[in-house]
Each structure stands twice: as structure tokens, then as C-alpha cells.
Amino acid sequence: MATETDLEELRRGSELVKRGFAKMQKGGVIMDVVNREQARIAEDVGAVAVMNLEAVPADIRKRGGVARMADPASLTGIIEEVSIPVMGKSRIGHRKEAEILQAVGADMIDESEVLTPADDEYHIDKREFTAPFVCGARNLGEALRRIDEGAAMIRTKGEAGTGDVNQAVHHQRNIKSAIRKLEGMDYEERDMWARDHEAPRELVHETAEMGRLPVVNFAAGGIATPADAALMMHHGCDGIFVGSGIFGAENPEAMGRAVVDAVNNHDDPERLAEIASNIGEGMQGDPNADLPEDERMQDRGN
């Protein structure tokens, strides 16, 4: 059995170690939480980790303004409350927010488009940190650029806070389709693809040879029901992030437990039917097609 020291070493250190910690979350559900009470509920219903932020994405959309890193005291309080990993969000390009999150003990940092970007041109150099990072991607080029910067986990961007899974599906299909195309290319064609998509050529070749991303790939953005979670697992995701879909639901405990069960039984329709029954209404959603262009969080970062 791993000791507390062993787990700490798995969380922090070399690229291999950081990727290893991220891989430990594979097959699980990571839930957004804004306080200790929500974190405790998430742990009780089976989340493998929680993501702390000052407001869930749906509420960030409603209130507008600048969305920033949560109060570090919120994260430390949650760390004291639960035994599962606790993650925190920083703004894209905001190195100091990431340094603060690392300093207070975040197990992983999400350089997230859900928050207002601090830098429109550059992401954080994640290789310089000991804490692992997760980043969003809409396509394979974005995913490989984030991995080259040091991301230990990729997630679909989707369209957070909408309750509409459409864009998460689209992004996952984009990534899988591009990988299949790379697998059918020869060495020179892969080099050309890397140039055309501004992707690191070594990672392009590694991805083609593996037939998948070299890091774990989770689904995120608009996942609001057990069926949504099962769908993303069907499309080959390694796990699920759920934001507004849990605590925006009528019965967060029932919804959270159902999403976890759906991930574990995503290939069993009869079991999924049982899981999805009598859990209360899900969050109120907004179709992605109705979003004004300036409200599309997925377009932040490149």
C-alpha cells in the first residue's frame, strides 16, 4: 500500500511522475466544487478528485465580469476536508496564479479557458512546475502543443457551463479522427502534418505510433447527465470532468452518484437505464448553437 510520502512523490516531480499521477485518475470522475461541503459530497458519491473554483462555469457565465483563480484558502480548506486529490484552476498564461496553487498544495492545476485569460498569446510553461497540469483542447494540434508545454493530462474543451455536450463530442471526434489519419501516414507526411498544424513533430510521431495521445485524455465541457458521461466514455475518453452538471442539478448527490456509476457501466445500456432513473432534473442548459461568439469559452487559448 502506498504511503503518504509515496503519493506525494507521485503528484510532483518529473514529467514521467506527473503523467503517472494524472493516469491514476483514469476511469474516474472529477467534479467541480466551490466549497468544503460540495467537496465532501463529491467524495461521498465516488469522485476520484475535485476541482476547486470560485464559481461553477454556469454561474460564471451568468454573472459575467472577470473570472479568476479562487481564494487559496478555499483550496486549503478542501484539502483538509477530503482524502481525494484536490485540483485548482488558473487563468491561461497566469503563471503567478499557478505558482500560488502549487504553493498551497494543489494536486493538479487546470490552466483553464473557463477563467478569463491573462495572456492571449502564450500559455504557462508547465515544464517548470512540480505540480502536474491539465489543459483543454479542441483538436489534436492544440492537444500536442499543450503536452509540449508540459501538460500531463488533456481534456476536451467542450463548452463549459452550457449543459450541452455537443462540443465535447465534436472535440473528441476531432482528436480521434486526426490520430487515425496520422496512423495511415508515412514519416514524411507526418512531418508535413506537424508543420501545417504547428505541432511538435516528435509528439506527432509518438502519437501516431501509440494510436492515442501520450497522456490521459478526459472529457469536459457541457456534460450534464449520466448518459452524457457514458457517451464520452464510448468515444474513447479516459475519464470525465463534470462542472455545473452536478451542483446545478435538482439532487446533486443522486446526480453525482449516477454520473460515477455511468462511467463505470458505460457499455451496459440496461444498467445505464437503471442509473439514469429517478435522479431528479438535470441542470438547465443552453444550446451551444445559441451562444454569441464572444461568449464561447472554447475559443480562448490556441
Swiss-Prot record:
An annotated GO BP: pyridoxal phosphate biosynthetic process
Residues annotated for D-glyceraldehyde 3-phosphate binding in this entry: 173
Catalysed reactions, as listed in the record: aldehydo-D-ribose 5-phosphate + D-glyceraldehyde 3-phosphate + L-glutamine = pyridoxal 5'-phosphate + L-glutamate + phosphate + 3 H2O + H(+)
Superkingdom of origin organism: Archaea
InterPro entries in alphabetical order: Aldolase_TIM (IPR013785), PdxS/SNZ (IPR001852), PdxS/SNZ_N (IPR033755), RibuloseP-bd_barrel (IPR011060)
Residues where D-ribose 5-phosphate binds: 32, 161, 222, 243-244
One Pfam family named in its UniProt record: SOR_SNZ
Broadest EC class assigned to this enzyme: lyase
Pathway note: Cofactor biosynthesis; pyridoxal 5'-phosphate biosynthesis
Positions annotated as active site in the UniProt record: 89
Swiss-Prot/TrEMBL keywords: Lyase, Pyridoxal phosphate, Schiff base
GO molecular function: amine-lyase activity; pyridoxal 5'-phosphate synthase (glutamine hydrolysing) activity
EC number: 4.3.3.6
Keyword Ribosomal protein appears in the UniProt entry: no
Coiled-coil annotated residue ranges, if any: none
Family membership: Belongs to the PdxS/SNZ family.
Function field: Catalyzes the formation of pyridoxal 5'-phosphate from ribose 5-phosphate (RBP), glyceraldehyde 3-phosphate (G3P) and ammonia. The ammonia is provided by the PdxT subunit. Can also use ribulose 5-phosphate and dihydroxyacetone phosphate as substrates, resulting from enzyme-catalyzed isomerization of RBP and G3P, respectively.
Subunit (UniProt): In the presence of PdxT, forms a dodecamer of heterodimers.
NCBIfam families, per the entry: PRK04180.1
Name of the protein in its database record: Pyridoxal 5'-phosphate synthase subunit PdxS
Organism: Halobacterium salinarum (strain ATCC 700922 / JCM 11081 / NRC-1)
Origin organism lineage: Archaea, Methanobacteriati, Methanobacteriota, Stenosarchaea group, Halobacteria
